Amino acid sequence: QAPNYSTASYNVVAVKINLFLSTNNKLYIHDTGVRAVYLAGMKVYLAANPTASSQTFNSDTLVYILDTGINEPNYYINLY
């Protein structure tokens, strides 16, 4: 399960997803470390395996990324 992060303890970075999406509107976001992503109020755990953290987003989805501060942010956004 995902850790229960508190937004008051970490830097919150707002990323506006406004990219070219494929015809199936599949946007894969995965992370090399232990992070959490807030999508429209829903916290999603990001695993090293891209398929484990795959989500379907709209092009106007606002993504909030919580950085634990332990390591430098290392996020990958793959479009398929």
UniProtKB/Swiss-Prot annotation:
Protein localization: Secreted
Summary of the tissues where the protein is detected: Body cavity.
EC class (word): hydrolase
pH behavior: Optimum pH is 7.8. Active from pH 4.0 to pH 9.0.
Chief place where the protein resides: secreted
Annotated keywords: Fibrinogenolytic toxin, Fibrinolytic toxin, Hemostasis impairing toxin, Hydrolase, Protease, Secreted, Serine protease, Toxin
Keyword Secreted: yes
Temperature-related activity annotation: Optimum temperature is 45 degrees Celsius. Active from 30 to 55 degrees Celsius.
Keyword Protease belongs to the record: yes
Activity regulation text: Inhibited by the serine protease inhibitors DFP, PMSF and TLCK. Not inhibited by the serine protease inhibitors aprotinin, elastinal, SBTI and benzamidine, the cysteine protease inhibitors iodoacetate and E64, or the metalloprotease inhibitors EDTA and EGTA.
EC number, UniProt record: 3.4.21.-
Gene Ontology CC: one annotated term: extracellular region
Example of a GO MF term: toxin activity
Gene Ontology biological-process annotations: proteolysis
PROSITE patterns membership: SUBTILASE_ASP (PS00136)
Membrane-spanning parts: none
Cited function: Serine protease. Hydrolyzes the alpha chains of fibrin and fibrinogen completely, has lower activity on the beta and gamma chains of fibrin and fibrinogen.
Oligomer and partners: Monomer.
Family affiliation: Belongs to the peptidase S8 family.
Protein name as catalogued: N-V protease
Lineage of the species this protein comes from: Eukaryota, Metazoa, Spiralia, Lophotrochozoa, Annelida
